[in-house]
């Protein structure tokens, strides 16, 4: 299994998790997959084990509950998001939880003026510490951290990158920031020095 942590449990994360469950439930349907086997791994080999978010409607919920919580509104690719188990085609670890991460620059001020059904609602609780996040990554044996923070969350993204490095996790950045340009060569070098990958 490839154990994955999700930073930013929003629409993109919902679509990814549901998509992986769909391909796990339908192993002969590879339409939509560029490659159904990469290095011997298939979609069914991915398991989501922990999440981090700032929205009070998601924090302290299970990952399964948070993925379908407001303001997420991406179309459903499966009827129900399932936890992994002996009789289940789910790809979410049983009991996987969403923890409160730091807001930093991850919430644009103007977003707080939008209606609740289309925007963030922060203030669930104080965010957990950097070391708590590192410990959660280690305790859940996370292999890869996926960054789905909102566009422009550069400081928050670097915070999670540093936690990933300290916990020995690879990092997939799914947002357009300067993280993967010349300005970020310093960050990239930190991953290289740690023997880790950043994509």
Description of each model-found segment:
Residues 3, 197-199:
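A short glycine/serine-rich beta->alpha loop
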Residues 150-166, 174-197:
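Rossmann-fold NAD(P)-binding glycine/threonine-rich loop
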Residues 1-160:
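N-terminal glycine-/serine-/threonine-rich beta1-alpha1-beta2 phosphate-ribose binding loop
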Residues 143, 170, 197:
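Residue-level detector of anion-binding/catalytic polar loops
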């Amino acid at each position: 299994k490839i154990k994955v942590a999700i930073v930013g449990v929003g629409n993109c994360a919902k679509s990814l998790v549901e998509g992986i469950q769909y391909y796990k439930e339908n192993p002969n349907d590879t339409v939509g997959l560029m490659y159904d086997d990469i290095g011997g791994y298939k979609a069914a080999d991915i398991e989501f084990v922990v999440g981090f978010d700032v929205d009070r409607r998601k924090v302290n919920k299970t990952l399964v509950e948070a993925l379908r919580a407001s303001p997420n509104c991406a179309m459903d690719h499966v009827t129900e998001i399932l936890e992994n188990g002996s009789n289940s085609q789910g790809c979410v670890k049983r009991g996987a939880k969403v923890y409160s991460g730091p807001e930093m620059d991850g919430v644009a001020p103007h977003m707080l003026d939008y209606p609740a059904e289309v925007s963030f609602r922060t203030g669930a609780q104080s965010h957990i510490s950097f070391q708590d996040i590192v410990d959660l990554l280690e305790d859940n044996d996370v292999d890869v951290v996926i960054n789905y923070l909102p566009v422009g969350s550069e400081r928050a993204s670097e915070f999670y990158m540093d936690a990933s490095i300290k916990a020995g996790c690879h990092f997939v950045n799914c947002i357009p920031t300067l993280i993967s340009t010349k300005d970020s060569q310093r960050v990239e070098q930190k991953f290289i020095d740690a023997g880790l990958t950043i994509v």
